[in-house]
């Protein structure tokens, strides 16, 4: 029997020829001997052979016609279903006879593209040697059918209830409002980046390069300094109004009267050019028109028309901002991003006010005792959580405080700290910035050798703790040799650090989760305390006196939270008071 077929022959044709060869094979093999025994005449034999061959051919033809008729009915039903309303025949519910079809999940029939992909993947998984042109044509027919189903509109695949749900979701004012606020926050982030980049470029690049970057936003007739100043002023004014708008509305749905007063909350000047832009925006319906209208509105916003002022009365802040513009306020490290300030100028202005407030606070002996005791209790609580004896720390801490309170050592201490970059002898610059914030930054990027020891699973926890403490002591010992004053303030600080640094390092970097949680809570409370101190909404920058009162209130509240978490008794009885009578000489205005 011949099972080979030509390259251009289809599967059906090859099957038909194979079946047609069966009678010939039977006749040549068995027919001659069997028919010879029957002793039929040659004519009768030919009639029987022709009858058998015709029967086989007729059966094959009937089967082929039946398949074509079934395909024609299916195509007609599909076309008619799409015309009438639209559900294709393949999606209509049909009777499922096999158990395999009943076990099909609905997720498999939700997407027609998944069907076509499964079909094509099944065809492509066949052996390539068994493919013929007919198989390729069959695959192409399946692909075309599936692609035509995919190309059909989404309506037939979705019920009217789903359409109504989507329309209600898209037209829901609350969802649209929340989406708009998310985009608004993204725009705020971009504006902040633009302002920070512009300020850094002005401080790090020549004026000619800054002019090239800001040339598109500034008028051609102005000088380089005025161009950068006007552009920065525009950005500051825009950010200020945007922050006010964001705080006023937030992410929740505002009341109707607040939405009606949206125009007033922006506080944009209603000039004639803006009225024309508003009328243009009302007539436009595309996002491109809105985008260009917003760009033109930003160009019409002038620095002289919208001054950069805080929402609350902040006379002290405004005076400090003037000093910042004249370059009279300096710092060791800019903490703009960490403390959530608008820009570097905003940070410097608030820093100047905070310095003056701490000077007012520390004029009172009770406040000096309060801040010194709070710091001691916090570190003691951390060491107790780490199961360490705080006796050595307490002795060195008291000795450092006695040295710092001696007025005859201030000149030496100032010279030491100036060599470390501290530009102001203030509690904030020394205790909060130089000691605490630098310690947190150092712990965020430890040496690779220390990390290798801590991440070694074959070493015990006690060995890791001992190795980390030895590394800290070695670093402090090497730094002691480089001190300009062997028995100065830095030397006393290193004596305290010998007891505290290993505990903090093992707490932040070590494998003990409970100790790590305690150290992270301690860090977060300190950082949030500083953020509240530099927030115009949390403290009053109207006068130095009011700012000092708010900082003392923040210090009491944060110390109660942190000491309560560490299980240490609070120091309420040592809370001092803010001096009422202060002179301008004391404030260094």
From Swiss-Prot:
Functionally, this protein is described as follows:
Regulator of mitochondrial fusion: acts by forming homo- and heterodimers at the mitochondrial outer membrane and facilitating the formation of pld6/MitoPLD dimers. May act by regulating phospholipid metabolism via pld6/MitoPLD.
Q: Subunit comment for this entry?
A: Homodimer and heterodimer; forms heterodimers with miga1.
One GO biological process term: mitochondrial fusion
Q: Indicate the family of this protein.
A: Belongs to the mitoguardin family.
In this chain, composition skew of type Low complexity spans 106-116, 123-134
**Bilayer-spanning residue ranges:** 11-31, 42-62
Instruction: Please report the name of this protein according to its UniProt entry.
Output: Mitoguardin 2
Species whose genome carries this gene:
Xenopus laevis
Q: Which GO terms describe its cellular component?
A: mitochondrial outer membrane; plasma membrane
Q: Where is this region: Disordered?
A: 87-134
